[in-house]
Amino acid sequence: MKKSAKIIYCCQRCGYQAPKWMGKCPDCGTWDSIVEERTTAASLRDVHRPQSSPQAPPVAIDSIELEKENRLLTDIQELDRALGGGLVPGTLILIGGDPGIGKSTLMLQALFGLANQGVRVLYVSGEESPQQIRLRSERLGTVSPGLLVVSEVDMDSILATIQSETPQVLVIDSIQTMYNAELASAPGSVSQVRESAVRLMLMAKKTGIPTFLVGHVTKDGAIAGPKLLEHMVDTVLYFEGDRNHMFRILRAVKNRFGSTNEIGVFEMKDQGLDEVANPSAVFLSERPANAPGSAVTASLEGTRPILVELQALASSTSFGTPRRTILGLDPNRVALLAAVMEKQLGMHLMGYDIFMNVAGGVKVVEPAVDMAIVSAIASSFLDKPIAPATVVLGEVGLTGEVRAIGQIDSRVAEVKKMGFTRCLVPDGNIKRIRNLDGIKVTGIKTVSEAAEMLF
């Protein structure tokens, strides 16, 4: 007897399920995101059931034998860095980013690097035909006989291809285009994305094939589909950057086999993505000399210190309420620091519009750049350039104190490497710096004390 389809209403944003339609999702609060989906209990059981899964008895954790971790290197050092040192066998990696940011380009270049090492790789595209992939590969210079390509969206066909071709690395581009015939909903729906990811996860763990899942993002920048998708995978990478800027940042926000918040920096060119081995030099290459409103600081991305230039412009406001336009920084943090400057430094910023930008389109969110924000605003407000070859570090509290920051040694080492000769750091960090040769490091306790040393 044929089972009738069960109708459920599912939120396309968070995966919340309800027996009837609602205009607003009660779980995530999104309007008009709940759509009708049809499925059967039998089909769901079929999708979740592994092909052959004999029951495994529990074992004591100390009796489990560890094999030597053999990571595959993609020949793209910035990607390997973001992954924590290469590809772990059986890992499931989700990479998301805005349309046109370079996700598919990065995947093709990574597979080309692996194919050149003799690794058998498979690129599954649900968005392009093999001819279109070949055209793009010709432009990128990534044509290789070891790079297998197939255009397919049906999960049964894809798993059959994987079983017959036995690739050592797999890319699915994209997970939102995959389709399970057992489910009546359209490709890209929450249930389709969830079930496709489950089947690929079971395959990856069983066969040991490292698998990349390329994911679309929503207009708020989150990966489209259920949040369960990010919980299910081993690594989540976000490809960030403005399409109007040439730099791209690959950021690891989750990594079971490496450091989180690790980044890789790339530059988009006509022939694809180029690695940026020394981001500090690139971000500071066009910095104007002796310009008011410019401050340099060392931001820590994962374990990697990068020197960035913060730019500020304070100008008299033409409106009753001054404007605060911030790019690349936390606007709330800048507003907080502006209030501290009014109270502690006596600068009447309420009559000034404040515009701030991080040069190169980088995003900086850590509190360790607070003193650089204060310095850039003060420099523009007073129309005085900061002393040459000076870098400013430190977190600022509401009472104007400058607090110690982490990884001070690696930050100061990067400052020295880039040729800066003077560094203002929190007084609490002075004793932790082991090597002071070739650079003058000055401890500061308050923002008012720092203001006297900046110019």
Which residue stretches match the model-derived regions?
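Peripheral, non-AAA+ core regions of ATP-driven protein-machinery
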Residues: 2-13, 17-83, 88-96, 101-112, ...
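Conserved RecA-like ASCE P-loop NTPase motor core of nucleic-acid helicases/translocases
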Residues: 121-125
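Conserved Walker A/P-loop ATP-binding site and its immediately adjacent core
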Residues: 126-132
